[in-house]
């Protein structure tokens, strides 16, 4: 394969990656044509086939526009894996003071690579969310956001500047932070600040 072809394939790969990063879904073949100055869609299909053969992209035959840039493809573009900051410990039992310091970083799981939000991780202490599968010592992956829908699991800051992991409910005139443990009572608050929504879970040990 000649060098110009290789460069064109990397150009296509970069456009696919940037488009998915920007809008969370890949471009059409015609959009690729326009972006890389190719007039023939068949030429683009040929480049995509070669990129797939190299292991730079994955395509789903059942979904024409489903194109995913693989880890190998990102390496070819010089893109390092994303990391999530681990910002401390949060309780799943009694609320504790929120920790904002960044302790370390954790590699972003592949299934969250297209998440457009700002993510962080917290280590969970306590057993109030065990019925939701969140155990003492787990790390929750949180998308930073200030609102949530009823029933979603959130990290919330109470009026005493304490953070807790609970299931969120907005009731008539108050907020209910509901534990997922039949032996524990909900936290009832007139005001609550949501720090983010729990979107993932990491556990590094199995009992």
UniProtKB/Swiss-Prot annotation:
Residue stretches in coiled coil: none
Pfam families recorded: LexA_DNA_bind, Peptidase_S24
Signal peptide as annotated in the record: none
Site (Cleavage): 92-93
Segments of the chain annotated as binding DNA: 29-49
E.C. number: 3.4.21.88
Species per Swiss-Prot/TrEMBL record: Lactobacillus gasseri (strain ATCC 33323 / DSM 20243 / BCRC 14619 / CIP 102991 / JCM 1131 / KCTC 3163 / NCIMB 11718 / NCTC 13722 / AM63)
One Gene Ontology biological process: DNA replication
Function noted in UniProt: Represses a number of genes involved in the response to DNA damage (SOS response), including recA and lexA. In the presence of single-stranded DNA, RecA interacts with LexA causing an autocatalytic cleavage which disrupts the DNA-binding part of LexA, leading to derepression of the SOS regulon and eventually DNA repair.
A Gene Ontology molecular function term of the record: DNA binding
Gene3D superfamilies, per the entry: Umud Fragment, subunit A, Winged helix-like DNA-binding domain superfamily/Winged helix DNA-binding domain
Subunit field text: Homodimer.
Listed name of the protein: LexA repressor
Active site (catalytic residues): 128 (for autocatalytic cleavage activity), 166 (for autocatalytic cleavage activity)
This protein's UniProt keywords: Autocatalytic cleavage, DNA damage, DNA repair, DNA replication, DNA-binding, Hydrolase, Repressor, SOS response, Transcription, Transcription regulation
Keyword Signal appears in the UniProt entry: no
Disulfide bond sites: none
């Amino acid at each position: 394969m000649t060098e110009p072809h290789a460069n064109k394939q990397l150009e296509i790969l970069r456009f696919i990656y940037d488009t998915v990063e920007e809008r969370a879904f890949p471009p059409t073949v015609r959009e690729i044509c326009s972006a890389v100055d190719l007039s023939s869609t068949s030429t683009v299909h040929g480049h995509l086939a070669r990129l797939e053969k190299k292991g730079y992209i994955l395509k789903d035959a059942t979904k024409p526009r489903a194109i995913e840039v693989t880890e190998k493809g990102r390496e070819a573009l010089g893109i390092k894996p994303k990391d999530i900051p681990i910002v401390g410990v949060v309780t799943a039992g009694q609320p504790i003071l929120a920790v904002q310091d960044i302790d370390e970083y954790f590699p972003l799981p592949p299934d969250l690579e297209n998440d457009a939000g700002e993510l962080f991780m917290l280590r969970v202490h306590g057993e109030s969310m065990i019925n939701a599968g969140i155990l003492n010592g787990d790390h929750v992956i949180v998308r930073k956001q200030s609102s949530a829908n009823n029933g979603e699991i959130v990290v919330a800051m109470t009026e005493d500047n304490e953070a807790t992991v609970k299931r969120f409910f907005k009731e008539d005139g108050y907020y209910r932070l509901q534990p997922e443990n039949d032996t524990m009572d909900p936290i009832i608050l007139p005001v609550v600040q949501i720090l983010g929504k729990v979107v993932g879970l990491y556990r590094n040990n199995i009992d």
